């Protein structure tokens, strides 16, 4: 973990209070579904952990879905609207709270200085791996970060609730950092190209491929 922090340029710097970032990529809602273009803006707060992610998905020619994923005061919420007007989904509750906290923990890769906050506990998880555990708002999330021989982070895996017919089930949720996917923003070297996959009993379901196009700290 220390080598990763050193290579990121975070050692010796104050913890970033906030991060604003832009994403572009592709997503799909089913293993056999079509890929849909996505653009998103996200803001992450590190003092009292919070984030807001606002995305626009081109579902079909002339049809756009607006999505908003939030985490604040220990509560997660996901809203989806068609044409920015008609509600498609509005989800909250314990499973969403756990999933949002797990997402927050995983996305500390974009705010390396915040990885040393008191609310994150690190422990060894074997060669090239470290387990991070975070408790906030009465909920605990944990996951394993993996690193290459140089100390660069290569991925993250955790268990998160996967929504399916009949109810949500805990499944393995995997983030893979694409080879050569690191960039430097504002003097901070971070991974900028990812894929996100559910590891399900009937096979892997990669549902999101993303690239950071911009990131700004404390603005």
Language model features with spans:
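Flexible, processing/modification-adjacent segments and terminal tails
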Residues: 78-138, 169
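Gly/Pro-enriched, hydrophobic low-complexity segments
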Residues: 132-217
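Short, solvent-exposed secondary-structure boundary motifs
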Residues: 27-38, 53-62, 105-117, 132-138, ...
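Short amphipathic beta-strand/extended segments with alternating polar/hydrophobic composition
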Residues: 32-40, 63-70, 86-96, 143-147, ...
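N-terminal mature ectodomain segment of secretory-pathway/periplasmic proteins
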Residues: 3-84
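Short, solvent-exposed aromatic-acidic interface loops
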Residues: 56-63, 81-87, 159-162, 196-201
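Residue-level marker for the onset of beta-strands and adjacent loop->beta junctions
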Residues: 38-40, 65, 118, 130, ...
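Short, solvent-exposed coil/turn segments at beta-strand boundaries
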Residues: 15-16, 41-53, 66-78, 125-128, ...
């Amino acid at each position: 973990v220390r080598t990763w922090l050193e290579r990121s340029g975070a050692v010796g710097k104050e913890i970033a209070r906030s991060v604003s970032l832009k994403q572009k990529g592709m997503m799909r809602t089913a293993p056999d579904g079509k890929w849909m273009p996505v653009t998103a803006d996200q803001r992450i707060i590190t003092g009292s952990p919070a984030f807001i992610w606002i995305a626009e998905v081109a579902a079909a020619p002339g049809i756009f879905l607006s999505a908003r994923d939030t985490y604040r005061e220990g509560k997660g919420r996901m809203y989806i609207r068609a044409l920015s007007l008609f509600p498609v989904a509005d989800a909250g509750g314990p499973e969403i709270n756990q999933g949002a906290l797990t997402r927050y923990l995983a996305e500390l890769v974009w705010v390396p200085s915040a990885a040393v906050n008191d609310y994150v506990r690190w422990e060894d998880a074997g060669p090239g791996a470290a387990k991070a555990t975070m408790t906030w708002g009465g909920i605990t999330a944990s996951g394993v970060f993996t690193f290459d021989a140089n100390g660069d982070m290569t991925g993250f895996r955790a268990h998160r609730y996967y929504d399916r017919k009949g109810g949500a089930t805990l499944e393995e949720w995997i983030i893979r950092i694409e080879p050569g996917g690191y960039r430097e923003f504002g003097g901070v070297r971070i991974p900028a190209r990812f894929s996100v996959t559910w590891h399900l009993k009937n096979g892997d379901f990669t549902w999101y491929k993303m690239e950071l196009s911009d990131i700004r700290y404390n603005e």
